[in-house]
Design a protein with these regions (language model features):
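Structural microenvironment flanking redox-active thiols in thiol-disulfide oxidoreductases
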Residues: 264-303, 310-320, 350
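Short, acidic, Ser/Thr-enriched surface-loop or helix-capping motifs
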Residues: 52, 232-233, 332-333
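Sec-dependent bacterial lipoprotein signal peptides
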Residues: 1-15
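A short beta-strand-turn-helix
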Residues: 228-251
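Short pre-active-site segment immediately N-terminal to redox-active cysteine/selenocysteine motifs
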Residues: 248-251, 255-259, 325
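A non-transmembrane, solvent-exposed segment enriched in polar/low-complexity residues
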Residues: 17-159
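N-terminal targeting signals for export/organelle localization
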Residues: 79, 91-93, 101, 143, ...
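Thiol/disulfide oxidoreductase modules built on the thioredoxin-like
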Residues: 299-305, 312-357
């Protein structure tokens, strides 16, 4: 019996040791004007919160592996925050009017260096812009010189991002730049394939991977993907994309939001083609995404929208169609096949004229 007890005790000790997880203690300092404000710590699908007291706050927890997190603080009209790496140790986040800095742990120090280099590049570009303005150049000369300065800045930024990814593709920091470097699915896949598990498993990278997969599923020539918004109709009843698409008409679906300037700018074009083609062969449907219903309803009072609108669609449609920017205007054929994506302005008018006649 004693022997069994001794062995059991050793086994329990080993199990306990095996269950030990890295811990972090994140301390932060901020202007005392934020005293009493809620501080949010967001990472992946997890979150934590605390309150600023005497210009300070802290978070403590366990992690399986280093993870990127955002710290957000708001007090009235004042907002601040920064990105940190939650990793074993005691990182210290300092928030000032000039920006933020997190020190005290290896990956956070690496991130500081990258942020400093990025800021230096932007500073150089801003100085070039100011210098050009002061030279009194003619408009054409100014635009040409500014374009050259912009190209230099873009090339420098890409080089910095490429070097940072190469040096950090096996830790979570590599996930910061992989989406910046990828211009399309092919480039994303190439970067993803050489990245380590820490980068591949990062929430932002998984989201981008899913977006490209959904973008492929909803590319031109593919059948439409249906979705239902439970209170999406004007009356607050369920409405589906299939209520309109695949019913024998060409249907132009505009994914938009009330706060989106380019979305509003496209409305006159949509109103023009709707007036011209509305009927047995053509319909427009607006899908309000990333927007509050009340804001959409208010916007409709001043916009030339006379076509059906699906309200309060949130992120569901944009996820399904791989959309990361609006407006996104997609044309569906009479059978529900996707005819074209990214239609705007004159290109939109020309495509409809081709299909429906002038």
């Amino acid at each position: 019996m004693k022997k069994f007890t001794a062995i059991s005790a050793v086994s329990l000790l080993l199990v306990a040791c095996g269950e030990s997880r890295p811990t972090y203690l994140l301390s932060g300092t901020v202007d005392t004007l934020y005293d009493g404000a809620t501080v949010s710590l967001l990472y992946g699908e997890k979150s934590d919160s605390t309150v600023v007291s005497q210009g300070a706050f802290s978070f403590e927890g366990e992690i399986d592996a280093p993870v990127l997190a955002r710290v957000l603080i708001s007090q009235g009209d004042n907002r601040t925050g920064g990105m940190v790496v939650l990793e074993a140790g005691s990182p210290v986040l300092t928030l000032t009017e000039e920006g933020y800095r997190c020190s005290g742990t290896p990956l956070n120090e690496t991130l500081n260096g990258f942020n400093a280099s990025s800021q230096e590049l932007y500073k150089t570009y801003r100085e070039a812009y100011t210098s050009l303005r002061e030279q009194g150049l003619k408009d054409e000369e100014f635009r040409a010189a500014l374009e050259q300065a912009g190209e230099t800045f873009s090339a420098g930024s890409r080089k910095l991002n490429e070097e940072f990814f190469a040096a950090n593709r096996d830790n979570v920091l590599g996930s910061i730049v992989i989406t910046r470097l990828a211009d399309g699915k092919s480039q994303f896949d190439s970067l993803y394939n050489v990245a380590g598990e820490a980068v591949r498993n990062a929430a932002s990278v998984q989201q981008e991977k899913a977006r490209y997969e959904n973008l492929e599923k909803t590319s031109e020539g593919k059948m439409f993907t249906d979705f239902t918004i439970e209170k999406g109709s004007a009356e607050g009843t369920p409405v589906s994309l299939s209520d309109y698409v695949g019913k024998g008409k060409y249907v132009l679906v505009d994914f938009w939001a009330s706060w989106c300037g380019p979305c509003r700018g496209e409305m006159p074009n949509l109103a023009e083609v709707y007036k011209k083609y509305k009927g047995d062969r053509f319909e427009i449907v607006g899908v309000a995404v990333w927007d509050e219903r009340a804001d959409t309803e208010k916007a409709l009072e001043s916009l030339p929208i006379t076509w059906p609108v699906i309200f309060d669609a949130g992120q569901l449609p944009t996820d399904l169609y791989g959309i990361n920017g609006i407006p996104q205007i997609i044309l569906f054929g009479p059978d529900g096949t996707i005819v074209a994506r990214n239609l705007r302005g004159e290109e939109l008018k020309a495509r409809l004229a081709e299909l429906l006649g002038k």
